[in-house]
Amino acid sequence: MDEVDDQYTPADVETAIETYWDDTNAYEATKEAHADDPSFFFVDGPPYTSGQMHLGTAWNKTLKDAIIRYKRMTGHHVTDRPGYDMHGLPIEVKVEEELGFETKRDIEEYGMESFIEECKRFAVDNRKAMDEDFQSIGVWMDWDNPYETLSPEYMEAAWWAFQQVDDRGLVERGKRSVSYCPRCQTAIAANEVEYDEITSPSIYVRFPLSNKEGSLVIWTTTPWTIPANTFVAVDKDLTYQAVRAEQGDDSEVLYIAESCVEDVLKQGRYDDYTVVEEYSGDELTGWEYDHPLADQVQTYADFAGAGEVYTAEYVEADRTGLVHSAPGHGQEDFARGQELDLETFVPVDGRGEFTEAAGQYTGTFVRDANDEIINDLDEEGVLLSSGTHEHRYGHCWRCDTDIIFLATDQWFITVTDIKDELLDNINDSEWYPQWARDNRFRDFVADAPDWNVSRQRYWGIPLPIWESVDDADTGDNSTSDDWIVIGTREELAERADQDVNPAEIDLHRPAVDPLTITENGSRYERVPDVFDVWIDSSVASWGTIDYPGETDAYDELWPADFIVEAHDQTRGWFWSQLGMGTAATGQVPYEEVMMHGFANDENGRKMSKSRGNIVTPEEAIDRAGRDPLRAYLLSHDQQGVDLSFEWDGLGEMQSTLNIFWNVFRFPLPYMDLDGYDPATADLSEGSMNIVDEWVLSRLQSVKATTRAAWEEYEIDTAVNTILEFITDDVSRFYIKAIRERMWADEDSASKRGAYATLSTVLDETIRLLAPIAPYLTEQMYQHLNGSETTVHALSYPSVDPEWQNETLESEMAVLRDVEEAAANARQQGGRKLRWPVPRVIVEAEDDSIADAVESLSGLLADRVNTEAIETVTQFDELIERAQPEMSVIGPEFGADAQRVMDAIEGGSREILTEGVTIDGVQYEITDEMITFDAEPPAYISAADFDGGTVYVDTSLTESIEAEGYARDVIRRIQQMRKELALDVDTEIQTAVDVADDRVADLVAQQRDVVATETRTNAFVDNIDRASENGQALIEEWDVEGVTVTIGVAPLKAQLSDQS
């Protein structure tokens, strides 16, 4: 066998294996090995090609890769095409930053076509960089054939889906109030709005009544919306009061909700008030008021129905109980305005600037106008109070600009018309965790508004809508509700007025913009908008298999078997797929969904540049390695729970994998020496003992637990079960138990049994861990076996019932508890494990514990290093010592109580019959005056375990001392062999000089044992001459307070025994 490094160095392993995979086409070999297996249709949630891999995307891709590897190893032909979201604002904003653009006007001046080409270049270049990022953490996907949302085949998938939606009558065009980014100058979806705490103006304003004394009082944090005010809303069931508010010699009548009067008047700093009259909200309906900025906004909403009071459901008994309503902005205001059949007054354009309809504010950006509007309200005498308000407010998900609400013409998928169908379809998918589906996701879907699918941008999939703009015969230029939705490139070629080659047409703007369609006497032009970028990824389940262009894969695979993303996708990709899948096909496009959390810092805070707490995957890999990072990320709860990244945790994972490396290394020199090939391990050969049978049974339990965990996507359970088996069962228990069998010189059935067992355990554990730590397991597999191109082409281990033995596992669990308790008792008694003890007594609480100890007494004696194991139901060597009960003795003996207690302290049970005598006075002692503590004698140490108590006899005999000192000397000699880097089979000569004559005699009694354990060929007496030999090593040691000088040299460089 090739040499294996003493230490696990992830970088060395990973570099070597990366080269090996490339040289052997290991990925292709793995796919080929499972080409005829049942299909598993995995769909990759496409990340935007707008940045580098961060810790969250590293976790996401590692999780996907692990699941794909597991599915392959369990007999599946996995669709593993990676995806990239390459359109939309995420790309546009990055390109604008590169070009130094600040507005759409900059893009128009630069040229739309040139800008789109820059977006395409940026997306493609970043995609290539992200390919490298993901491959750098060992992700095996079809990197030569990713699905890209900018490809004509994929764009066609979106067109086809939208056509299906239109055929169902679910496409609608109309003016609605939408979230709008004034910098990007486009509508954005409600689920794209991100929220932060901001400080806004807080003003209370009087709206003077037209036909009555007094004013309605409203409160708002958006003074800029007051020019668009159309009506005031009240709650029909609330009680409102007309109060005469007094301030000095002045007074005025204000109309406020009863519950808000005190707070509002405090804001206005009024001295006192009286209630003039009370009204219900219903009674206020129809009251008219004067626009507070009528002089500044001459063309304010002055049409029929404007400037009146109406009831509305969105009014609450908060602030003033009256709501200033501007249907041109607020979404609830717009909806109520539509119900009231009011015109929609919108004095703001797509740049977020006031139009000429806003009078003196024309050309001002809306938020920049806040101060001017507040001043004007004050000068008009209608500003009751002005301050600031801290609250959460939305901003654009890509450029961070605060959004505005603007009523604009948009295109919608009316998902509200199929809400019941959507909610029913949710039940057709299984979610991990299930609560994410039944609570978070269902609630989001239930409240989802109609989907605004149009964006007033450039880099995206163009809306495939051609709208009728005139009548070919009459030249009528009025628009209508007549439009055509094109579903494929072939259809476009057939229906367009211009020549279109479907195989070559670029479906992006501006190529499709000039195309027209003339049918039935009408001329149709394409709507200039592009799709909401969430439409792109919503069709991934068929776009990734090139449907509708290719139908075979769709017929065989669709819907997706499995998708996985973070919990923010409940309102993102999980929703968009459900929405489009249901609207276009009537089905949910996925069968299983896994939702993981976010990767945060060690304190659970979001990682960000401003906090300076970002941990990059590259940084983690440089410190610990790819496999340790993968295993660390996957060892935490994967279902809906955020990860708090800790460097210590990553370091511990590297240490854990190093333990596995040491387990892997341990038998190699012995096997090499004996010519044993682990690839040919056969459990039917050799002789098994109880620990072999136990570790093989534990292996079956681990396989069962691990497989069950994978099937429920409890990846952390799988990872931790495997690693705990490696560290606790194999390394700390089994390896220690078989060390002497491996060390033995002669061939034996027992040694062959140990070889076969450990080879089997290693082979199957390597395969169990392969999806988690692909580099390390590949290195181990190729060293131990290598019969296949790659470990990842092998089958995942299955449970072998022949080796299952639950009784043995239970008994061994008891043994290990007893062993741990014995170690604790030794520590209390100051006796190291290397030193034997005369006996260990197990006081068992029940028969099952006693039976287990007796069944495994031989092994247990060896593990706890004792000459004898005794099992008892009650340990009868405890010494009882009396403890006085002061609460009883004090009242009974008064002034003599303390002397009585001193006499009782530490006494025996005879006190109860004989009493105590003090200065010739006899005192009778009763049961209630004493409690008894049972303590072991000085030479016994004790420790409890779940099934009883372990007592360790730490008394010393000459033979025990001799063996103890010998074991200490053996450990030092073995350490020196390591320092000399000697092979396992290298024989040595040894010199041992003990400063204490008595201890020297004890060690001499064990000389044969020392020789056998250390492969000492001969002992020599003259240690002083050893320093003359350059290959010899001489060291001085402190062994239990005695100075022991040891010289060690390989036979080729013998120590001199001549004087």
UniProtKB/Swiss-Prot annotation:
Q: What is the lineage of its organism?
A: Archaea, Methanobacteriati, Methanobacteriota, Stenosarchaea group, Halobacteria
Give the protein family: Belongs to the class-I aminoacyl-tRNA synthetase family. IleS type 2 subfamily.
Q: Where, by residue number, does ATP bind?
A: K609
Task: State the oligomer form and interacting partners.
Answer: Monomer.
* Physiological role: Catalyzes the attachment of isoleucine to tRNA(Ile). As IleRS can inadvertently accommodate and process structurally similar amino acids such as valine, to avoid such errors it has two additional distinct tRNA(Ile)-dependent editing activities. One activity is designated as 'pretransfer' editing and involves the hydrolysis of activated Val-AMP. The other activity is designated 'posttransfer' editing and involves deacylation of mischarged Val-tRNA(Ile).
Q: Where is this protein found?
A: Cytoplasm
Motif, 'HIGH' region: chain positions: 47-57
List, separated by semicolons, the cofactors it needs. Zn(2+)
Q: Where is this motif: 'KMSKS' region?
A: 606-610
Q: What is known of its domains?
A: IleRS has two distinct active sites: one for aminoacylation and one for editing. The misactivated valine is translocated from the active site to the editing site, which sterically excludes the correctly activated isoleucine. The single editing site contains two valyl binding pockets, one specific for each substrate (Val-AMP or Val-tRNA(Ile)).
Residues that span the membrane, as ranges: none
The source organism is Haloquadratum walsbyi (strain DSM 16790 / HBSQ001)
Q: Which reaction does it catalyse?
A: tRNA(Ile) + L-isoleucine + ATP = L-isoleucyl-tRNA(Ile) + AMP + diphosphate
Q: Which GO terms describe its cellular component?
A: cytoplasm
Protein name, UniProt field: Isoleucine--tRNA ligase
Q: Does the keyword Transit peptide apply?
A: no
Instruction: Enumerate the Gene3D superfamilies for this protein.
Output: HUPs, Isoleucyl-tRNA Synthetase, Domain 1
Tell me which NCBIfam families the record gives.
Answer: ileS
Please, one GO biological process term?
isoleucyl-tRNA aminoacylation
Please give one Gene Ontology molecular function term for this protein.
zinc ion binding
Q: What is its EC number?
A: 6.1.1.5
Keywords from UniProt, A to Z, are:
Aminoacyl-tRNA synthetase, ATP-binding, Cytoplasm, Ligase, Metal-binding, Nucleotide-binding, Protein biosynthesis, Zinc
The source's superkingdom equals Archaea
Fetch the Pfam families from UniProt: Anticodon_1, DUF5915, tRNA-synt_1
Q: Does the keyword Zinc apply?
A: yes
